[in-house]
Amino acid sequence: LSSENRGARAIAEAFGYSGDDLASIPAEANMGLSCGNPTAHASLRPGETVVDLGCGGGLDVFLAAAKVRPEGRAIGIDMTPEMIERARRNAAKGVDGKPYSNVEFHLAMIDKLPLAAGSVDCVISNCVINLAPDKQAVFREIARVLKPGGRMAVSDIALKKQLPEEVSSDLLAYVGCVAGAILIDDYDRGLRDAGFDPVEIIDTGSDLNVYGEHETEAAGRSANATSGVLPIATAGCCSPDAKSARSLYELLRRYNINDYAASVKVYAIKPAN
């Protein structure tokens, strides 16, 4: 699956990636798994170290690498060997045959990062934190690795109100980055409890029904895409296989998911002292 797949490209463009963004990275890095473009609002600067939680094929890592320039570092974290392998292949391939020199990828859980405390300028993530079983542990780990004054700029799914039972209990909705989400107020409170201040969570107004409209096109996954710790394990966030995608579409068609959930931009700063 790549930017050459119509569904993957449509989802990426619906959530903030421009044609130039997608053309500037290896096509296989875009797997149609987005709910926003965190690099667009992270204010990344040359020389910074940025970490992407749940990097998948490396889409946001490669975009971040261009912004921090060769003197900076872009680090991808993913829980599955398949995704790390894919990301490393993409990094070696690069664009126009020129490999990336300032990226690295690590196999790890996002609540147990293989990074030193106070070593990171910015943490980004795209439609992944909502899938974490212990979100508070993730928030604490982000705070640990950030430098004083460091920031997080995350694109995620959060709830405006509680989901209907049929949706919240359905694993397919979980794979679709919906049922794992928490209320916006709980997201805000969790970050503040982890020590972040200020915190701002903004509803982007993006249409979440795009998942149902394009998921069956973007779900060109291998047969083992649902064989791991969770169905998201090898496929990444927001990415059921084609058969599951059709079931997800049928489920979400019975509801206007925009009434319950939102694609949000999350900004938070670790106090300087």
Label the predicted regions.
Residues 50, 123-124:
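Hydrophobic beta-strand segment of the Class I
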Residues 136-151:
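A short glycine-rich, Lys/Arg-flanked "PGG" loop and its adjoining helix->strand segment in the class I
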Residues 45-112, 137:
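Class I SAM-dependent methyltransferase SAM/SAH-binding core
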Residues 158-178:
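Short, glycine-/aromatic-enriched active-site segment of Class I SAM-dependent methyltransferases
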Residues 180-201:
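Short alpha-helix
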